[in-house]
Amino acid sequence: MSDSQHTIAGTVLTMPVRIRKADVHTAMFSVPADAAQRLVDYSGLQVCEFRPGRAVVNLMLARYIDGDLGKYHEFGTCVMVNPPGSDARGLKALGDAAAFIHHLPVDQSFTLEAGRTIWGFPKIMADFKVRDANPFTFDVSEGGSLIAGIEFHRGLPIPSLRPRSQVLKTYTFSEGTTREVPWEMRNSGVRFRPGGATLRLGDHPYAKELASLGLPKRAMVSGSVANVEMTFGDAHILR
């Protein structure tokens, strides 16, 4: 990761951008691979088939509490894709796959501008309603139209002797360019369970795109992370 700088709304950000405290809820859905591929064809990337004819879409809510981009909420639609040049399949391939970010609504203008400018993230302004209980629920809307709502039931704690650091990558597409975003994550307070999350789609155009995937109402796997630290480096152009 470099120490380059970017000026966003008069504020100088020195790379890597640091997120010191966040929490995340995520739901993993199994969808037809051909539908997922149609959704991301514009990126030039290939979805990862973890089973014959099946791909993975993750829907997540992240609450950024303390970081260089400020305090905000973020909803992500992430399609798991193979690294460029790979056509690997199966569960092992899924372990090597990365998230292509197709939707990324947020509720603060600074992170919107930074995300678009530095990494090509497809951020739009949206409204969030969160009920922090068990079950944990949230709705995300834009312009008065519901995109999605998800209800999460608490998962089982995953034991860890110490917070683990993971080196990851994410792909974005903006203005005809596909980029790879390197980032590192350190987390603790992890919970997972089979199922455990129920999806409700609205009438927003994003919701219609999600419906085109044949998303089931119930997730294959869901989870939460109570404490997340992240660093994001500069994006690299792929094509």
Where are these regions (language model features)?
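A mobile, often basic/glycine-rich helix-loop segment
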Residues: P16
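Amphipathic alpha-helical segments
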Residues: V31-S43
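Residues in flexible loops and secondary-structure boundaries
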Residues: A35-Q37, G67-L69, D87, A207-E209, ...
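Non-catalytic surface loops within mature trypsin-like serine protease
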Residues: V31-A33, P83, D234
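Structured soluble/peripheral alpha/beta segments that form catalytic or ligand/cofactor-binding pockets
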Residues: I8-V12, R20-T26, L45-P163
